Design a protein with these regions (language model features):
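Cytosolic Rossmann-like ligand/nucleotide-binding regulatory domains
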Residues: 454-506, 510
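A generic structural signal for short beta-strands and their flanking turns/coil linkers
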Residues: 444-446, 466
Length: 511
């Protein structure tokens, strides 16, 4: 039986098989990501302690320089051996699901794990969440290859692994599912969402077993409801965050050019750019150790400290600049949590300014930390649903959902008006442009929904790329074989046979 025949049979597979596979992915990916998260947390604690001691013991600074350089060299060799461990990892997962990238799961898994732990532990302002998504996806890919699944089934497991990775990193299972649908897979498929949700829930259970049941960013006191008469402030905040988000994306997509210039000056190959980054971070570690790392501890501290406008502004500037420097190095590490941290600081700056103007009182400042995270991330990622649910799950307070929704929507609209792209899609385009072109013509099956733009049209009237065959249309649990005179029905699911390297092109045509 060839792969296409297997896909035809598995399209009607009972959902309990999807649940079973989701459990398998959730347990394994949850364990891998939870260990990754635990090691990073321990490494970050040690790093902060050493920096605090070094301020009073200059000899320790020499030790920090030595260790940082050794770690940077080790990570550089890991990157040289496997380029797909660079950066966040989310664009790599998206590229694989589109049939554009085909990395070795084991080669990426262990190198991303080790490189991420080393890089983030020295204090670089990188997030664990992007790598966690890639680690979850590669763990799931390994399971799929072990189970000898078809290419289509493998993609479902990879998507579920990505959801499980985010869930275990943030204890946010619903956001894990939404992120896969909104940012990675781009549409609902029954087998995808059942497998992904199961994997997310199981991975979250594994993570909760290790880290406890409090939300990742649980606030120390209950947040008050924001008065309706002041909602105009939320609109201003959304505009502010949208503009900042656009600026962030513009720079983060170009920071690599800065390192290319430095690389020419210091005669460094790209995999050793991190040698400069680990030196850049030392002054921040000595004088602002609480600003190091991904930023979750800083977000919690903002809630308790209520920093003045000048302090919050200084923190925002430092985090913005050094987050860019950290990510531009190409070290394994993401921008997911750093984006949330910049959003929290932006919200804090905004709230402090409006308090000085007399529009807010101090009890409302913590609300703006939450709103800043949701709006900033929603703008940069252009995944507003994920932003809203993620922040709500992380904070553990459903009462703020209305205000979060307003700010996230406005920030998203501003970002769209300014012409900003979803940051991970933009990174994927850059990645593909600098990767060897796919020339293979491996047939595989994909499923896509019939959208409003296609509903009511005849199949023979569609302009399809070469090698694309629409085989089946399923509507209200009724299956029909597709031919030229078949009329597409809104809400139906189409099963198509395409060349694997054309998945992205076909999805754009249908979605």
């Amino acid at each position: 039986m060839n792969e296409i025949e297997r896909d035809f049979r598995t399209q009607s597979m009972h959902l309990l098989w999807s649940v079973w596979r989701g459990v398998l992915v959730g347990v394994t990916a949850g364990a891998v990501v939870s260990l990754f998260r635990w090691l990073i947390a321990k490494g970050a604690q040690i790093s902060v302690t050493i920096y605090q001691e070094a301020l009073h013991n200059p000899l320790l600074i020499l030790g920090i320089v030595f260790v940082n350089l050794v770690f940077a060299i080790l990570i550089g060799y890991l990157i040289k051996q496997e380029k797909d461990i660079k950066g966040s990892g989310i664009p790599h997962v998206e590229g694989e699901l589109m049939g554009l990238l085909h990395p070795s799961w084991w080669s990426v898994l262990w190198r991303k794990f080790l490189g991420g732990v080393l890089g983030i532990s020295v204090g670089l302002m990188l997030g664990r969440e992007g790598p966690s998504i890639q680690l979850g996806a590669m763990t799931a890919k390994g399971l799929a290859e072990g189970l000898k699944l078809s290419a289509r089934e493998k993609r479902v497991l990879i998507a579920a692994g990505a959801a499980a990775g985010l869930s275990a990193a943030f204890n946010a299972p619903i956001a894990g599912l939404l992120f896969v649908v909104e940012e990675v897979y781009h549409h609902f498929s029954r087998h995808v969402w059942v497998t992904a949700l199961t994997a997310s829930l199981v991975a979250n259970a594994v993570s909760l077993r290790i880290f406890g049941q409090l939300p990742v960013l649980a606030m120390s006191e209950k947040l008050p409801l924001f008065p309706l008469k002041d909602y105009w402030i939320l609109i201003v905040l959304g505009i502010f965050l949208g503009v900042l988000g656009y600026g962030y994306e513009w720079i983060v997509l170009r920071i690599g050019k800065f390192y290319q210039v430095l690389g020419k000056i210091f005669h460094l190959p790209s995999h050793f750019y991190g040698l400069l980054t680990v030196l850049f971070i030392i002054p921040i570690g000595l004088y602002f150790p609480h600003l190091l790392g991904g930023g979750n501890e800083l977000i919690l501290a903002l809630n308790d400290l209520h920093p003045a406008l000048t302090v919050a502004g200084l923190y925002l500037a430092i985090r913005f600049i050094w987050s860019m420097l950290s990510f531009g190095s190409g070290f394994p590490g993401g921008i997911f949590l750093p984006i949330l941290t910049l959003g929290a600081l932006s919200g804090s700056v905004f709230a402090a300014a409006f308090e000085n103007l007399g529009f807010l009182d101090s009890t409302q400042l913590p609300i703006f930390i939450i709103l800043g995270m949701a709006g900033y991330f929603g703008a940069v990622s252009k995944a507003p649903l994920t932003a809203m649910i993620l922040v709500t799950e992380m904070v553990g307070d459903l009462h703020q959902l209305m205000t979060i929704g307003v700010v996230t929507l406005i920030a998203y609209l501003v970002m769209d008006f300014l012409g900003g792209e979803p940051v991970y899609e933009a990174m994927l385009h850059h990645l593909i442009d600098h990767s060897p072109k796919q020339v293979d013509k491996i047939p595989t099956m994909i499923d896509l929904p019939v959208t409003d733009s296609l509903a009511g049209r005849l199949v023979k009237d569609l302009t399809l790329p070469d090698g694309v065959l629409i085989s089946t249309q399923i509507f209200q649990d009724q299956s029909e074989v597709v031919h030229g005179d078949t009329r597409l029905k809104a809400g139906a699911t189409l099963y198509l046979v395409v060349n694997e390297s054309n998945i992205s092109q076909v999805r754009k045509l249908f979605l």
